[in-house]
Amino acid sequence: MYAVIKTGGKQYRVEVGNKLKVETLPAEVGSDIQLDQVLMIADGEAISAGAPLLDQAKVSATVVSHGRHDKIRIFKMRRRKHYRKQQGHRQNYTEIQITGISA
């Protein structure tokens, strides 16, 4: 059984036991959360798709940790003009583990 959920403006295909890094969620480490924006659930041959969301479907997860991704470097340069600009960025994330899928 798997589901497609939407959180943080992105869509993820999840199964029970998966760990994934999503955009920062306002939850404490170790707490249980309910993700109710479920787009699709597939259970063997039966597939339920929402238009756009399924009403009664929920995915439960546990917050494992909060952290920051690796730094990416943004570098802009104009040739022959002595113009160089460098900037770095680290995105915050929340790591969750999927504990259940209910339709």
Swiss-Prot record:
What the entry lists under InterPro entries is as follows: bL21-like, bL21-like_sf, Ribosomal_bL21, Ribosomal_bL21_CS
Give GO BP annotations, semicolon-separated: translation
Tell me yes or no: is RNA-binding among this UniProt entry's keywords: yes
Keyword presence, Cytoplasm: no
Q: Could you list this entry's UniProt keywords, alphabetically sorted.
A: Ribonucleoprotein, Ribosomal protein, RNA-binding, rRNA-binding
For this record, an example GO cellular component is: cytoplasm
What parts of the sequence cross the membrane? Answer: none
Protein family according to the UniProt entry = Belongs to the bacterial ribosomal protein bL21 family.
Role of this protein: This protein binds to 23S rRNA in the presence of protein L20.
| Subunit and partners | Part of the 50S ribosomal subunit. Contacts protein L20.
Q: What is this protein called?
A: Large ribosomal subunit protein bL21
Name the source organism: Nitrosomonas europaea (strain ATCC 19718 / CIP 103999 / KCTC 2705 / NBRC 14298)
Higher taxonomy: Bacteria, Pseudomonadati, Pseudomonadota, Betaproteobacteria, Nitrosomonadales
